[in-house]
A protein has these predicted regions:
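Structured catalytic-domain cores with a bias toward divalent-metal coordination
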Residues: 1-145
Length: 145
């Protein structure tokens, strides 16, 4: 993806920057909720790597792995881009539940639908804004082992 813009959720990520994006998710009743996205873009173009965790709200270990990954000093020399989503299932994390409040498994709801259940709507936003992005050379979602 040389010499091209990197735009996620209408936010342009410039070379050599670290950006936090709060992607708006479907509301739960009248409560606004955001999906935290951390983007670390090196000063030079290179591969794009995507890592996500907590697609199930009871899988907390990946959140800590991503937190530690973000602090690695080697990222100051990054050539390329690292896109991190430490908590995909924000609703499940709030309740320490594998599922969303509609009792659906987010991991089984992709690619989602904007008219569907809460899980389907969350999947649609996440899929359209992040997962369907075609320039990834590597993606990893962290689950319990």
């Amino acid at each position: 993806m040389p010499n091209s813009k990197l735009i996620i959720a209408d936010t342009e990520i410039l070379r050599g920057t670290r950006v936090t994006i709060n992607l708006e998710l479907p509301k739960l009743y009248n409560t606004p909720t955001n999906l935290p996205i951390r983007v670390i873009r090196g000063k030079k173009d290179g591969p794009i790597v995507f890592v996500s965790a907590a697609i199930h709200g009871d899988e907390l270990n990946g959140i800590e792995i991503i937190r530690r990954l973000r602090k690695l000093s080697i990222l100051n020399k990054l050539k390329g881009t690292l896109i991190l989503v430490p908590i995909v299932n924000v609703y499940g994390i709030m309740n320490l539940s594998r599922y969303l409040p509609d009792r659906r498994d987010l991991n089984r709801s992709f690619p989602g639908s904007i008219q569907g259940s809460l899980a389907s709507r969350v999947a649609k936003v996440f899929f359209d804004e992040i997962v369907s992005w075609k320039y990834f050379i590597f993606t990893k979602k962290i689950h319990l082992i």
